[in-house]
Regions:
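Residue-level recognition of the GNAT/N-acetyltransferase active site
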Residues: 24, 81, 85, 114
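Conserved acetyl-CoA-binding loop-helix of GNAT-fold acetyltransferases
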Residues: 80, 86-99, 126
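Conserved active-site alpha-helix within GNAT-family acetyltransferase domains
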Residues: 91, 115-133, 138
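Short acidic/polar active-site loop segments enriched in Thr and Asp
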Residues: 45, 107, 130
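Acetyl-CoA-dependent GNAT
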Residues: 3-70, 139
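A conserved beta-turn-beta hairpin within the catalytic core of GNAT-like acetyltransferases
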Residues: 64-75, 85, 131-132
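Conserved GNAT acetyl-CoA-binding A-motif
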Residues: 94, 101-113
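Conserved beta-strand segments that form the floor/walls of ligand-binding pockets within enzyme
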Residues: 48, 74, 79, 110, ...
Length: 142
């Protein structure tokens, strides 16, 4: 039976490097750790779905406040292990974080999906998300 576990410490999150590398193959333990050092103080956490010691899915999340939305939960770096896709893992994480946002009295859940990731767009729309705008990016470094 799978377990849902919230991770809040750097040590716990560093153990998730193999599944993070499915999103970011070039990440080393050092790169990942340095980023976590900057993210965790800003309320970054991770939710993992684990079964028999194997992480089947991971969803990073933050709870914050913005002028346009008020209090919100942002899903970030969501990945289902390539061996466990299309088995409901993404739905389990999304439903858990939806309830967490309700419990935390958030006004909404926000996330970004790449414009080329049509599978993710369909998945989130099937879970009640609607496209609200564009997330523009201007790269400043190569």
């Amino acid at each position: 039976m799978s377990q849902l576990i919230e991770l809040g410490t750097k040590a716990e999150m560093l153990e998730q490097l193999p599944i993070i590398q499915q999103l970011y193959p070039d990440y080393t333990l050092e790169i990942y750790g340095n980023l976590l050092d900057k993210m965790i103080p800003h309320n970054y956490k991770q939710l993992v779905v684990v079964e028999n010691g194997i992480t089947m899915g991971l969803a990073g999340f933050w709870i914050g406040t913005k002028l346009w939305s008020g209090k919100y939960l942002e899903m970030d770096n969501v990945v289902v292990h390539e061996d466990f896709r299309s088995k409901g893992i993404g739905s389990i994480m999304t439903e858990y974080l939806n309830q967490k946002a309700i419990d935390e009295n958030c006004n909404m859940i926000a996330l970004d999906a790449y414009t080329t990731n049509f599978g993710a767009q369909k998945f989130y729309m099937n879970h009640g998300f609607v496209p609200k705008g564009f997330h523009f990016v201007k790269y400043l470094k190569d």
